[in-house]
Amino acid sequence: MMNTGKQKPGKRYPLVNWADGMPVNKKHFIQLEDHFTDRLCEYQSFQLNRANYGLLPFRKGEAVSGDFSITELVTGTLEVRLKRCLALTAGGYLIDYDAGGDDELTASFHIAIDETEDKDQRWDVILMADPFERLPSGIPDEKETSPRQPDALPNYALSVVPTGQIDGNNLGRHFLVIGRLRKNGNRCEVDGNFIPPCTSMSSHPDLKNYYLKFGQLVDSIEKASSDILAKVENAEKQTPLAVNIGMLCRHVMLFISDIYFSYRNEGQYYPPLRFLNVFSTLAHRLYVCLGFMNKEEKEDLLKYFNEWNGINPGAYEGLLRENSGLLYNHQNIRPLMITAERFLYQFNDLWTTLSQIGRASCRERV
């Protein structure tokens, strides 16, 4: 005889215990649908973590995945209007909202008088999607004797809360921060600097621009490394400075060769965390390379860099340390991109300058 074990009760949406001859009504089908919806969300959530949920890549013909605006009513109340949103919540639920020709989803809020004095006031725009609360939709079929709207849509709700009041990483499985508002003088506007949680570098226009921009900088750094190394190898005299610069160039070129194919073909689909890992690792490798040199050689190298692009030795090492030790925050992506961008621009500027130094000048020092 088979011993059938009992599971612990308490599932949010249990299966229906079907039996022959049982009375059936719509509640049973709703329970069944809720069970599989919940299971699908939970299965999807197993593939998610704190760094790969959020806005999805926008569809062809659309400029953004989360489109909302803000207007001020004559009463002084501020109203946020959501036009569309395509995203994946941390709980694995797909948000696919498009107002189309219907009324847009709205949320109203009012700024208290004492808050208007805070010049740095910001508010998070949060979208809630509840697939278990259905809203009737569609045009009734005239052939049905009992008129009803044939379709059902998930319930969506929009809210606006002061930034920092709620931790975006712990909102719950059906909530998502989709944008931010900020004060600009005496009025509020959409904060264009804020990048909400995104599943990939193709989920936000600014992230796509970072992907393209960083790719161009990588190409430039690789070419400059090759040119510098050629000068070092062809120099009549191999000084310690020349050897160390050549060593840095080799490490840079080997690193780029390791990531180039993947970055070129998959980089635009990387989650922001994986994307930043590429450049944080490059900075860390350069920082480690400095540690290969003795104290005098490192000081000589950093002084040489300072002569050609004005970065003082302490600032250069600090730049490498800052990018090596990035702490990723899915709710605050922009500052991390700016940090990586600053490193790449300064390193590219230095390397490009060194690659353009004339041979005579190169032989004098290198």
Regions found by a protein language model. Name each.
Residues 9-12, 97-115:
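Short linear interaction motifs
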Residues 3, 143-282:
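Mixed-charge (acidic/basic) macromolecular-recognition segments
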Residues 38-45, 96-99, 132-143:
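Short, solvent-exposed secondary-structure capping/transition elements
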Residues 266-366:
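Extended, amphipathic alpha-helical scaffolds
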Residues 69, 95-96:
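Basic, amphipathic N-terminal segments
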